[in-house]
Amino acid sequence: KVEAPEIGDDSRKFGPFIKDYSAYFMSLNRGKESIALNLKNTDDKKIFDKILSKADILVENFKPGTLEKWGYGWKDICKKYPKLIYASASGFGQTGPLKELPAYDMVVQGMGGLMSVTGQPNSEPTRVGTSIGDITAGLFTTIGINAALYDRQKTGKGMYIDVSMLDCQIAILENAIARYLSKNEIPKPMGSRHPSIAPFEAFKTKDSHVIIAAGNDKLFEKLCNLLNISELANDSKFSDNSSRAKNMDELKKILENKLSLKNTDEWVKDMEKEKIPCGPIFNIKEAVENPQVGSRNMIVKAYHKVI
């Protein structure tokens, strides 16, 4: 990981901190070895060239044109290192009228349409609770790199990969964009509700909420039987998913009337026995301490020479 001398990665200054070390930075950069180089400096360029001569992949996230100014654009690099896979991840990509503008996760969540379908109806603009603009760009970049590595096995040549954070946001809006392109409908926030599947949202119980995702007619029938309202599965307003989606509000009232009789934990146990997709809504502490998460080694202890 190449960082600017003295300044370093901005995220080194983002909290929370443990003994003046950013836990945020460490979570994003675990397993990486950092080096500080000034690519405008001749001696530092020699070090960077030595690194590139042995590298399989170069990943950069400068604004388009920055590395070109320093002599490390793709057109220059591919001549020196023809097997190198060069991946650029930026806010708006290497082409288009916005290519030279800076961007952060929040910017592309807004411009990509994601914030317009997030939150409660008629609420203020709501950011998704994680940096999904950054994360999806990283994932799409990784997919591109893997494809390029596979191609190199056959051709022996490197490849240039251009990933735009904005493009990635557009790519993940599968339902919203389909609705607009097919129906000219502009989707709006619906809280936890799915726009096309029902019941598929959070429902109130006696003590909190439970997620129910009955994604087909058989699962809905199981749910109705469990709630002792088996006749609902044969009601023309709810007998198939299309009908249920048209009558979501009415369906929710009926289901919550029954779900209010027990606590969430009780309903989860009952539904799990019937193999109905469901679950509680955990806070971060509960999610991290979930035995399932622990069994998958998602949270592990790591050694740090200072901390």
PLM features: residue spans?
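A glycine-rich dinucleotide-binding beta-alpha-beta segment and adjacent secondary-structure elements
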Residues: 273-307
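Short Pro/Gly-enriched beta-strand edge/turn motifs at strand-loop
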Residues: 8-10, 181-187
